């Protein structure tokens, strides 16, 4: 049995200077909102926003470009739509504590009536980290932080009180109400394709894996590596939805 291909649309928010420049920020948001509702009317399965704080480095005169924050804008799009799934491609794990992110995700799942997909990754845009005062840890540390974050988020979404102590993060008797509408929790999409660490996190935590760059041949290779990680922990490789 073959699965139906699902289609998602990245909604303009300013990342590549993709909002009209001759109108107010409010009108720019309304432009993006209208595209989101249009996508829903055309039966797109999902809409997505990028989680960055600065426009792409390819944008000229970035100080002149409107660029909306991901989670705030996605909450507004959740209210403007009724059935389309909503997600981040992908949330930067470094920008919010995992306990706060769990609370934000549960709230957005309630606002949207159970339509959240939590897209998350390690983060990579180093100049953005520097501009906003975030520590840019080595890749291996960022991946391990992501692993701990997903442990915390999953616990807070599924347990009345959650406790966890790792190397980088800890919570004690953390309560997350409202709990997510989706059970056992909203789908978790993990972006990234590092073979030793990131794909191991995908195998452990992800309901969906996003492979964002590369040729079909590279995708095939990465999937073979992901399958190996799944086999190591007894995870069904086919239980992870693949996205590009």
Language-model-derived ranges and their functions:
Residues 1-80, 184-186:
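N-terminal beta1-alpha1-beta2 module of alpha/beta enzyme domains
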Residues 2-5, 61, 88, 94-205, ...:
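Internal, glycine-rich beta/alpha segment that forms the wall or movable "lid"
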Residues 9-13, 51, 88-90, 120-122, ...:
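A cross-domain feature marking catalytic cores of carbohydrate-active enzymes
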Residues 22-23, 90-92:
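The substrate-binding groove and active-site-proximal loops of carbohydrate-active enzymes
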Residues 28, 32, 70, 74, ...:
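Aromatic/hydrophobic pocket-lining residues that form the small-molecule binding cavity
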Residues 45, 82, 207-209:
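Receiver (REC) domain switch/active-site residues of two-component response regulators
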Residues 55-56, 64-66, 93-99, 213-221:
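Acidic-and-aromatic substrate-binding clefts and catalytic sites of carbohydrate-active enzymes
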Residues 81-89:
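Conserved catalytic cysteine-centered active-site region
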